[in-house]
Amino acid sequence: MIRSVQVEDAAQIRDLCHQALGYDSSLEKVATQIEKFNMPDSGHFCFVYEEDQSGKILGYVEAEVYESLYSDPGLNVLGLAVFPSAQGRGIGRQLMERVEELAKSRHSTFIRLNSASHRKEAHVFYERIGYDGNKTQKRFLKIMD
């Protein structure tokens, strides 16, 4: 079942981010972010795939409203993760379909996402579900003290 993320999901989301994406974060950080994202008009959306039998979260997708001066409104997928042991079962596809439903309901004209250049399997997945890898970019980051 796909549903909106809840603060009670924070520990499972933290573990999922670590195992599927290699990101480490504290339980407090994940819980705080979920609380912020679930506030009205936050512009963030996060859905989880919860296994019916066990209640275990097997995947999640996170998106935000993307608006700029030069484009129509869209959605930006910030993260999609499925536990490695649950990959290949259609969970990622279902989560992305939920984002597509959201985009249609919000009259978004596109969905965009970035995927690290070394994540070749992810690229194949996105292309298989209809996304076009049409741009190569270099990301610049400045850590603020």
Regions found by a protein language model. Name each.
Residues 93, 105, 117-136, 142:
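Conserved active-site alpha-helix within GNAT-family acetyltransferase domains
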Residues 4-11, 15-73, 78, 134:
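Acetyl-CoA-dependent GNAT
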Residues 5, 80-82, 115, 131:
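Hydrophobic adenine-recognition pocket in adenosine-nucleotide-binding enzymes
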Residues 65-68, 82-85, 118-120, 145:
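Short coil/turn motifs at secondary-structure junctions
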Residues 73, 89, 105-109:
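Short coil/turn segments at alpha/beta junctions that flank glycine-rich nucleotide-binding fingerprints
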Residues 79-82, 88-101, 128:
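Conserved acetyl-CoA-binding loop-helix of GNAT-fold acetyltransferases
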Residues 96, 103-115:
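Conserved GNAT acetyl-CoA-binding A-motif
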Residues 16-20, 102, 125, 129:
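Alpha-helical interaction/dimerization surfaces of two-component signaling modules
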